Structures are given as C-alpha cells and as structure tokens.
Design a protein with these regions (language model features):
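Conserved glycine-rich Rossmann-like NAD(P)H-binding loop of the short-chain dehydrogenase/reductase
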Residues: 25-42
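N-terminal Rossmann-fold NAD(P) dinucleotide-binding loop
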Residues: 15-16
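Phosphate-coordination loops involved in phosphoryl transfer and adenosine-cofactor binding
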Residues: 2
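Conserved glycine-rich cofactor-binding loop
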Residues: 11-12
Length: 62
C-alpha cells in the first residue's frame, strides 16, 4: 500500500526533488507551496510521468 507524503516548498529545488524521489518509490504526494501555477504544472508533469501515483496540490505559505 502506498503512503501519502506531505511536502512543503514543493514548487522548486529540494522540495521538488524530494517529491520526485517519493513518486519514483511508488508513494503518493501532497505538494504544497506558494506558487499556485507552478503547483499545477508539477501536478500535470508528475501525473504524466507517474500515472499510478496520486498527486494532490494545496497552495499555502507555511
């Protein structure tokens, strides 16, 4: 069973790399960040690359 992993700051850099690593391991991810457009772009890219995982996005500033 896949785990659901929450990642803050997922729109670039380390956060984006961590999200990709978890998806490669078969986990689902919850992406959060301030840049709404970038979150939606990543969601689309990840859905195409990892069709068996679920990606949720929530714009927020921690």
């Amino acid at each position: 069973m896949a785990k659901n992993v929450v990642i803050t700051g997922a729109t670039s850099g380390i956060g984006e790399a961590i999200a990709r690593a978890y998806l490669e391991q078969g986990e689902n991810v919850v992406l959060t960040g301030r840049r709404t457009a970038r979150l939606e772009t990543l969601k689309s890219e990840f859905a195409e690359t990892f069709p068996n995982q679920t990606v949720w996005t929530f714009p927020l500033d921690v």
